[in-house]
Regions:
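Aromatic-glycine hotspot motif
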Residues: 1-129
Length: 129
């Protein structure tokens, strides 16, 4: 995969109008299920961790520390696009497992889509306090 391919993959997981975090969150109405808050925080923290590791081995700037999920999703699409192609094979260790930059970013896209599905499933559950 090229940096452009990875950028597109992340953009689709984050922003596609039908199946993405953005699409799932657009279905949330009223008082959201508390698990949705946990999932969005988890996605934010995980994306920040992945990209901090990528920054350490590629020399790119790390993600903005004050970015919430929406801003971080837009940031990572552009960051992936700007990666030098040769950096995609750089090795990263995450949770004791070796990944290349490219494989870690593919993991990030899968992880994002997985949790987008959970958010979508919870979006229709209205909480009455």
């Amino acid at each position: 995969m090229t940096p452009e391919d990875l950028s597109t993959l992340l953009d689709e997981a984050n922003h596609h109008p039908w199946e993405s975090v953005k699409a799932a969150l657009s279905k949330v109405d009223g008082q959201p299920h508390p698990r949705i808050g946990w999932l969005t925080t988890h996605l934010t923290e995980t994306k920040r961790t992945y990209w901090t590791l990528v920054a350490e081995v590629t020399g790119i700037l790390p993600p903005p520390g004050d970015a919430g999920l929406t801003r971080l999703m837009a940031w990572e699409v552009e960051a992936a696009r700007k990666l030098p192609p040769e950096s995609l094979t750089s090795l990263i260790h995450y949770e004791g497992t070796p990944f290349t930059v490219a494989s870690l970013l593919r993991l990030s896209a899968r992880h994002t889509t997985w949790h987008a599905g959970q958010i979508a499933a919870l979006a229709g559950r209205v909480r009455i306090a």
